[in-house]
Amino acid sequence: MSEDLYEDDLDTQGSSGPRHPMAERFRGYLPVVVDVETGGFNSATDALLEIAAVTIGMDEKGFLFPEHTYFHRVEPFEGANIEPAALEFTGIKLDHPLRMAVSEESAMTDIFRGVRKALKANGCKRAILVGHNSSFDLGFLNAAVARNDLKRNPFHPFSSFDTATLAGLAYGQTVLARACQSADIDFDGREAHSARYDTEKTAELFCGIVNRWKEMGGWRDFND
């Protein structure tokens, strides 16, 4: 399937008046960082347990910054598989009295609402998922969308930006904690494997790599 099928949505050419710099930077796509914590590796059968998303903003000089975080603990869908090893790895306690999980539909609807608001504010037409090993997060997001028959999914269905790849290029590191350390981003291993924490650190890493590229002369906005 070709990305060209989605180009008409972006309206990247021929629009009247100046476009928002963010829309210009990524051809009408808005980067949104997403991380999920799950009950296993299979997006079709394993539970989505946490999801977080960070929208990305751009300052007047064209530098990116993490803007707003959305986070939900999620109730496993009916019949979902949850591997004990996954719970041990993430430290998630499903029966914790303060977990306060919501349904997949509620979590996704809230995040999509926030993303659409950011799209409008930045003059973008579609979000593109940014993740550390992004195909994993996009797979679980798409599976939740399909299970709940959600309409108006703002994310591109198959394209993404992978910070594991970007960090490998920029710093020679593909593990999130090590990439953050190389980028002088504080990383507390005790907080890792929380969707909120990992998403916020991934957002810092993504913004840092893109901004570093700009500082090196790799991209100039249309006002330069």
Swiss-Prot record:
Chain residue ranges for the region called Disordered: 1-22
Bias (Acidic residues) ranges: 1-11
Cofactor (UniProt): Mg(2+)
Record's keyword terms, sorted: Exonuclease, Hydrolase, Magnesium, Metal-binding, Nuclease, tRNA processing
Annotated active site: H193
This protein's record includes keyword Disulfide bond: no
Amino acids binding Mg(2+) 1: D35
One Gene Ontology biological process: tRNA processing
Enzyme Commission (EC) number: 3.1.13.-
GO molecular function: 3'-5' exonuclease activity; magnesium ion binding; nucleic acid binding; RNA exonuclease activity, producing 5'-phosphomonoesters
Site description Important for substrate binding and specificity, residues in chain: F41, F89, F136, F158
Assembly information from the UniProt record: Homodimer.
PANTHER family, A to Z: DNA POLYMERASE III SUBUNIT EPSILON, RIBONUCLEASE T
Name assigned to this protein: Ribonuclease T
Native source organism of the sequence: Pseudomonas putida (strain ATCC 700007 / DSM 6899 / JCM 31910 / BCRC 17059 / LMG 24140 / F1)
